[in-house]
Amino acid sequence: MERCSRCHRLLLLLPLVLGLSAAPGWAGAPPVDVLRALRFPSLPDGVRRAKGICPADVAYRVARPAQLSAPTRQLFPGGFPKDFSLLTVVRTRPGLQAPLLTLYSAQGVRQLGLELGRPVRFLYEDQTGRPQPPSQPVFRGLSLADGKWHRVAVAVKGQSVTLIVDCKKRVTRPLPRSARPVLDTHGVIIFGARILDEEVFEGDVQELAIVPGVQAAYESCEQKELECEGGQRERPQNQQPHRAQRSPQQQPSRLHRPQNQEPQSQPTESLYYDYEPPYYDVMTTGTTPDYQDPTPGEEEEILESSLLPPLEEEQTDLQVPPTADRFQAEEYGEGGTDPPEGPYDYTYGYGDDYREETELGPALSAETAHSGAAAHGPRGLKGEKGEPAVLEPGMLVEGPPGPEGPAGLIGPPGIQGNPGPVGDPGERGPPGRAGLPGSDGAPGPPGTSLMLPFRFGSGGGDKGPVVAAQEAQAQAILQQARLALRGPPGPMGYTGRPGPLGQPGSPGLKGESGDLGPQGPRGPQGLTGPPGKAGRRGRAGADGARGMPGDPGVKGDRGFDGLPGLPGEKGHRGDTGAQGLPGPPGEDGERGDDGEIGPRGLPGESGPRGLLGPKGPPGIPGPPGVRGMDGPQGPKGSLGPQGEPGPPGQQGTPGTQGLPGPQGAIGPHGEKGPQGKPGLPGMPGSDGPPGHPGKEGPPGTKGNQGPSGPQGPLGYPGPRGVKGVDGIRGLKGHKGEKGEDGFPGFKGDIGVKGDRGEVGVPGSRGEDGPEGPKGRTGPTGDPGPPGLMGEKGKLGVPGLPGYPGRQGPKGSLGFPGFPGASGEKGARGLSGKSGPRGERGPTGPRGQRGPRGATGKSGAKGTSGGDGPHGPPGERGLPGPQGPNGFPGPKGPLGPPGKDGLPGHPGQRGEVGFQGKTGPPGPPGVVGPQGAAGETGPMGERGHPGPPGPPGEQGLPGTAGKEGTKGDPGPPGAPGKDGPAGLRGFPGERGLPGTAGGPGLKGNEGPSGPPGPAGSPGERGAAGSGGPIGPPGRPGPQGPPGAAGEKGVPGEKGPIGPTGRDGVQGPVGLPGPAGPPGVAGEDGDKGEVGDPGQKGTKGNKGEHGPPGPPGPIGPVGQPGAAGADGEPGARGPQGHFGAKGDEGTRGFNGPPGPIGLQGLPGPSGEKGETGDVGPMGPPGPPGPRGPAGPNGADGPQGPPGGVGNLGPPGEKGEPGESGSPGIQGEPGVKGPRGERGEKGESGQPGEPGPPGPKGPTGDDGPKGNPGPVGFPGDPGPPGEGGPRGQDGAKGDRGEDGEPGQPGSPGPTGENGPPGPLGKRGPAGSPGSEGRQGGKGAKGDPGAIGAPGKTGPVGPAGPAGKPGPDGLRGLPGSVGQQGRPGATGQAGPPGPVGPPGLPGLRGDAGAKGEKGHPGLIGLIGPPGEQGEKGDRGLPGPQGSPGQKGEMGIPGASGPIGPGGPPGLPGPAGPKGAKGATGPGGPKGEKGVQGPPGHPGPPGEVIQPLPIQMPKKTRRSVDGSRLMQEDEAIPTGGAPGSPGGLEEIFGSLDSLREEIEQMRRPTGTQDSPARTCQDLKLCHPELPDGEYWVDPNQGCARDAFRVFCNFTAGGETCVTPRDDVTQFSYVDSEGSPVGVVQLTFLRLLSVSAHQDVSYPCSGAARDGPLRLRGANEDELSPETSPYVKEFRDGCQTQQGRTVLEVRTPVLEQLPVLDASFSDLGAPPRRGGVLLGPVCFMG
């Protein structure tokens, strides 16, 4: 066996299994190769290969972006050893001070670490927090940051740690840890970095291992002889002649790699070990005691550079290749070669001050070496007085521990911690039902499957340890670090295997609303709903803008003392003081190895007088902070004067999210889940604060004596033995060289001032020692000269808060702070004193509408004025109904600042906000405790205030808040645009009688009739119409007050009147609209009712309040002048039906209205109930000529006949010819009241007949049903404003009345333009009614006299000539329902007149019963395809709305289960022509309806010609749906049935086409976008093959896929199996385009694909590597989205199935596959790809 292999196969001498004392459970445990555990051979990001310490070695170069970590449990599944060795071969960048390896606990506490540089630090902290940071070992005087290779070993045993560097220098430091130290292995181990530390390791590393026990650290030095190839060295003469001569028990144990493979060639290879006993090169004989660690009090520091002399003179014949240890200049900038190392002489000569030492430690004394025990003689005499001990730098003399300090204050509660770590996976669920059988795959051609050659792996290791929830715990540990050390996002972690199919779940909640459908036809206007309930009180509005700075306030009282300031910067080490005088003589003590602290020296010379700072209040010192890392030495900056506080900067944007709080408590462990894959290494966690030391556990009981073990190997020389017998005092030795600076001792008491010595030469500055205890306060010194401005130091670690100090003086008024969070409502404060009235401010914008004020008392009646040009305004009418709340006005300008109110009660503590970035420096705080005196710097100039800091970065989104309470309804939206005019609605049922209309305008006076005979005095006639307006008469006496009138119709809102005087302050207004939802706050307690506030300034005029109770009738005012025409108001909402009014006087006929537009025929309504008998109607117009019948004699009126049964429909008769108009018949006798008939079926519309001649004007008939609502008229000109009325006397304020119930709105009629109002005549006294005089002779016409009194109504005169068409009259209000008139004799049926123009739209009637479904209107052109929007957030649950009216029929739903046969229904009307079926039999003509009232003559509107759409792929030509003989030209008769059938057929076909577009069926002509869309539209579809078209263009590129509805609607595409590189085809074998796959990815959220390959006898094949569609390499080792679904190769049978399930949709489908063991011979089998399935 060759003496040396490559140096990267470092032969680590491992402890023997026999007789080694290691930590429990670690006997024979293997070493841990940290580089391999961190996957260095696979070269992760930031790592590349480099040359090692020997040219042929392999090392790894680590750059800054590398992030290398792994769960600690993965490396140490059995726990971390108590005693261990840490071995490494490393080369760092010159000048670097960075960690090499750090181990963190689950709580993020740094437990173990090794930091390289100058100096070398070893970090250790066990579970009890020991040792404290100041006691952690630091190896000063060593520098490993020189850019050269170093072999470093660290041995930790007991209470000490030993560092061995290059086998030349060995330093031991105490490690005061607990007796049973335990390190937590549930955390993470990180290479080359620390959490929240900028310094990272940069350099090369060849070996890094952790070995249980300490022997490996010492044995590693024996391998110095096993250097690079060709560098074999001679052995010293005192060593054994040759390795081959050793006994088998003397062979050293070595750590090997297979020599025929490189570390990176086989990723799955494991280290294996052969154990050889160690050999020792010691000149002593006999047995060697076991290794003993030094006691905590002793310090062992052996610098063996003198013991291992340079070797140039001893090795002149050894030739080393020039590249053996050459440092690469291009890497770190240093060149040259190191001198070769030769064999060392491990023996030393004996002298006065020397003992025999080996390379590995001190040798044994003669007594110990031979006998194993020291024989003690009699006690010697008392020795002479010892010399004073000289504490040289480098020595550490530990004094006794000080008394326990007082307990610190309870710290403030920490911010809310992050969520705890994810618990272990739960128990496996019960197996689900068996899935549906998959469809049979297409049989592939034999032997043409894709064959990818496999190769067997040459070796296989055992399965790794179980890692249950390491990744989740590591993430929880490292959450704090992800903000500070945010690297590129790592790959997603492994997911567990999918469980079996579960039981079907309960029905899910209602899904979200689908996409908005096309706009339907506009429905009829619904009734106005009742007024809604008053909304809840809105939330407080957003905080106002920042106000202007107020005037400076009065200086306040002194505030409480602030918290102690941050610790000051550490001062420089002072110069060495003069040598103290010898102390008083002490008693002679026994000579010890290391003496106790010597007698205290004389006090040193007093230092220069320092400046005395202002004395601050004594604060209680906080506990010591965590020791920070030693930064690079910088120049000491001088302390500048305190600057004045600068003006506050602009408000910055919210800073980034602060660091999370401390880790929450670990939850209880869940039950152990199935074994998961090893998790990816987590990010490093942050430095946690040191934990409090735990209580020392009770000592355990002494164990039983164990059996004697076998003879162990020859041990190493132990540490220093116990004190021997006092020897003879030796001669005083030569003065030794100055040692390194030691730790400063405790400050002694102030001694007597000595004489001033001469100024010595300033010495060189030593290294910074640890910070000593605080010195006493020195006397006040004179101020020094101003110094230079120093650099700004780094921000120190904030100390713990101290006690609050005393109250300081009140500071000046600061600038307004940022608005705070809204606190809870405080209790009502006391009423403040009334302030002086301020000056009148500018008129603010109109505020929100307030509630109705209390009704004021009636004002005093004004005096009657004379007839002026304009009378005073009339009495105020009753208030109208409450209108809707107006939109809130714009925010007014900020008023002047009010007086300070009484302080409210403190609100509840708010939730802790996110920590922002460090803001700009604040104003100076209270003077903290006196810091350590620094060097007196020169005084700097006074600085200017700094500019405001830049705005912080945008904060990260916070965690989700608590679910807020239900918000108030938002403000009403803006009115939408007018939709297209809808079809005419169905006629409603007859409305209830409305209120009586007002009197009509006076008609034209008719011609005087011939005088009739004098009649007897009849009953008093009805009041006649008003005559012409006479001249104004004299004012009559005051009439009696009239009875209270009916409530009038709400008047229109008049113009805004002149500004009135200041009114009494109104009550609080209604809440405004809901503001934007704020942060959810907790419900506060209800506050108390406050006292009334001060009188406010005059408010703007409020809107009309709700109607109050009717007031007393006031006196009749003087007639006012006629006002100008008002502006017609907007149409009011539909009011409730009013109570039946008294019968009004008969009005005059209004002029006929304009001709309306033609309406579509509506379905016949149900027959209404028979009304009461009405008055006889006027003679009707001449009817159409009927068929000639035989003239019969008029018989006497017969008794009323009974109601006959409904006869069967007659056959369709031929249309008769139009006859000439018949003679007007006499009005028939009133017939009996008939019973209510059943609803008749709709008859076919008759052909229009010619218009008949205009008949004579008849008497007024009964009031007809309200006509359709007319279009709103043009707005009239605005009326002139009336003159301002005189101010009434100010009435006393009335008591607040009970708020009245809101009155029901009255019926709203359309307001027409009001006619000119005549002056009101005086009220005449009622005269007695005289008898009618006799007939007088006709006299000559006299002159036109004054208008006489209104005479009685005369008899109806003959019909006058038809006047010209008048202007369009106003629609009258709904009259009472008239009694039914007598049934007239049936007239002959006339020809059907032409359809009249549609009339004006009448008032909306009451909701009618459900009518027949109307015809579907023509569909509009399809809009452009919109992009699929993102799914919106679910809105807040709205209050349940009233039930809406029946909408138009929806699309046909899925076929339901067949119901039981129903009862035979009545025959329905003939349906429209179907889309594709043959024409049905012609329906029977319905019974001829009674002739309607002839409409006014109008123009015949020709129907528009129907333009058929051009035939496209997705439309159907309507004319093709009819038989050829039924098709008619477009210019045919518009009223013929064939044209309507064609239209209806086209509508049906269009409806089907639209239905297929809205609800695709998955066929080739109606493809869906994805299978998810098919599932949403047709949830009843089974699994199978369907057509999809993801890009929704032309359907020619649609392709067929397999839809797995059972799995939620997956769209699966099958790969081809006849090519060497995978491509994907549809179910018919056609390739799927790249564009279609891209669209399919855009419509999906995840995808998965299975890959399987057969096993062929090997225990495990090499890893399968897959290439995704985006060229990513996918394998279980590199991607968290690839996992083994079934491992058949583990049992050497079946197949192994990998599942790729990824949210990165660009990775699928898989395009190629290969194996990593391609060097092996091929074997049977290939890779079988399953379909790729996309889930939308």
UniProtKB/Swiss-Prot annotation:
Pfam families: COLFI, Collagen, Laminin_G_2. Residues 615-624, 1029-1040, 1176-1187, 1388-1397, 1457-1467 have a biased composition (Pro residues). Prolines at the third position of the tripeptide repeating unit (G-X-Y) are hydroxylated in some or all of the chains. A disulfide-bonded peptide called proline/arginine-rich protein or PARP is released from the N-terminus during extracellular processing and is subsequently retained in the cartilage matrix from which it can be isolated in significant amounts. This is Collagen alpha-2(XI) chain. GO terms for biological process: cartilage development; collagen fibril organization; roof of mouth development; sensory perception of sound; skeletal system development; soft palate development. The gene is COL11A2. Residues 1541-1735 form the Fibrillar collagen NC1 domain. It is linked to Otospondylomegaepiphyseal dysplasia, autosomal dominant: An autosomal dominant form of otospondylomegaepiphyseal dysplasia, a disorder characterized by sensorineural deafness, enlarged epiphyses, mild platyspondyly, and disproportionate shortness of the limbs. Total body length is normal. Typical facial features are mid-face hypoplasia, short upturned nose and depressed nasal bridge. Most patients have Pierre Robin sequence including an opening in the roof of the mouth (cleft palate) and a small lower jaw (micrognathia). Ocular symptoms are absent. Residues 260-269 have a biased composition (Polar residues). It comes from Homo sapiens. Residues 487-1500 are annotated as: Triple-helical region. PROSITE patterns: NC1_FIB. Belongs to the fibrillar collagen family. GO terms for cellular component: collagen trimer; collagen type XI trimer; collagen-containing extracellular matrix; endoplasmic reticulum lumen; extracellular region; extracellular space. It comes from the Eukaryota. Residues 215-486 are annotated as: Nonhelical region. Residues 57-228 form the Laminin G-like domain. Ca(2+) binds at D1589, N1591, Q1592, C1594, D1597.
